[in-house]
Amino acid sequence: MNFKIDKTDGNARACTLQTAHSTIQTPIFMPVGTLGAVKSLDAIDLKEILDAKIILANTYHLYLRPTSKVVREFGGLHGFSKFDRSFLTDSGGFQAFSLSKISKPDENGIKFKSHIDGSMHYFTPKSVLDTQYDLSSDIMMILDDLVALPATKERIDLSIKRTINWAKIACEYHKSNKQKSVGIDQNIFGIIQGGTDYNARKLCAEALCEMEFDGLAIGGLSVGESNEEMYDTVEALMPFIDKNRPRYLMGVGTPEDLVQNVERGVDMFDCVMPTRNARNGTLFTSFGKINIKSAAFIKDDNKIDPECDCYTCSNFSRGYLNHLYKARELTFFRLASLHNLHYYLNLVKQMREAIMQGKFKEFKREFYAKRGMI
């Protein structure tokens, strides 16, 4: 991976990273394609309509179904899905933690029960990389020990001990495999844990920065803490994360979360929010969210967002989308998802432009003013 910082504005950064499949300009939002597909969209939608440069897929789900071995037979995720730009794959640790009724982390990995058929499985730092080698993702995430917040100091200390040990194993395993021509075009990111405990986060960050990771992620946030705790944790952590590697905040978040964390120096984001909200009738606009289910939109001939030029806004009215949603017409899910993802991708594009011009503070002020939040 080639990575360079193009411009900074305060702590906000505009960077460029190059993988084997695409050039990615940051700040970047990654649409979530858990099963190798962003719900209701296909590769043409992602490339030609949204111009997405990178999407996220999930190791846990693809490991269970159709299995990573099947995906490998198609040439990895790129051949399987026909999305020929970059993929980032999560390690699956979060899903093993959150979806399994029986999830038991120990010193060597995580034992969990499949949410599909109840079968038992075991993830280790090496096995999740083996699965991701099969998937041929451009960026692979290591296995980490996630803790729901709030948590005791003892549990957080155990989490970072495991996470650091697993990171060492994963880093050395990937380095060894690349010497055998395995995963030579794949990059590996470490994950910093520690809850909202400053000392734990600092310890974990410093340990992982000593390792040969291509990028560093902040995990274990947006799992029960307040927004203020999230922002404070990210801000306190940034001085300890190597500035010459991409910084990825996992599973975050709202448009406001993106703006706040870009301001603090984060480069990469992912979240199911734009597509999940779209399917439930909540659409993002420059002036805040609207609920397209509302009777107020039945005869509304305006587009979703007066400032939006996405495919949906360029062709269809609020009234039409209101009708599609109430009729449970499947077309609604695609049109709403296209709009919400365009909104997110355009938001990070606007932030990049503001950083490049040295006007991030002005951008942030206008962003909140439009929402009536100043």
From Swiss-Prot:
Residue ranges crossing the lipid bilayer per the database entry: none
Question: Which Pfam families does the annotation name?
Answer: TGT
Residue numbers spanned by region RNA binding: 251-257, 275-279
Any one Gene Ontology MF annotation carried by this entry is: metal ion binding
Q: Would the keyword Glycosyltransferase turn up in this protein's UniProt record?
A: yes
User: What metabolic or biological pathway is this protein involved in?
Assistant: tRNA modification; tRNA-queuosine biosynthesis
Instruction: Note the superkingdom of the native organism.
Output: Bacteria
Q: Name one GO biological process term.
A: tRNA-guanine transglycosylation
Q: What is its EC number?
A: 2.4.2.29
| Reactions mediated catalytically | 7-aminomethyl-7-carbaguanine + guanosine(34) in tRNA = 7-aminomethyl-7-carbaguanosine(34) in tRNA + guanine
- Binding sites annotated in the UniProt record for substrate: D90, S91, G92, G93, F94, D144, Q193, G220
Q: Can you name a GO cellular component term?
A: cytosol
Sites binding Zn(2+) sit at C308, C310, C313, H339
**What does the cofactor section's free text say about binding?**
Binds 1 zinc ion per subunit.
Enzyme class label? transferase
Q: Which residues form the active site?
A: D90 (proton acceptor), D270 (nucleophile)
Key word Glycosyltransferase present in the record?
Answer: yes
Q: Which cofactors go with this protein?
A: Zn(2+)
Keyword set, alphabetical order: Glycosyltransferase, Metal-binding, Queuosine biosynthesis, Transferase, tRNA processing, Zinc
- Relate the assembly described in the record: Homodimer. Within each dimer, one monomer is responsible for RNA recognition and catalysis, while the other monomer binds to the replacement base PreQ1.
The record describes the protein's role as: Catalyzes the base-exchange of a guanine (G) residue with the queuine precursor 7-aminomethyl-7-deazaguanine (PreQ1) at position 34 (anticodon wobble position) in tRNAs with GU(N) anticodons (tRNA-Asp, -Asn, -His and -Tyr). Catalysis occurs through a double-displacement mechanism. The nucleophile active site attacks the C1' of nucleotide 34 to detach the guanine base from the RNA, forming a covalent enzyme-RNA intermediate. The proton acceptor active site deprotonates the incoming PreQ1, allowing a nucleophilic attack on the C1' of the ribose to form the product.
Q: Which family does it belong to?
A: Belongs to the queuine tRNA-ribosyltransferase family.
The name of this protein is Queuine tRNA-ribosyltransferase
Species whose genome carries this gene: Campylobacter fetus subsp. fetus (strain 82-40)
Protein encoded by which gene: tgt
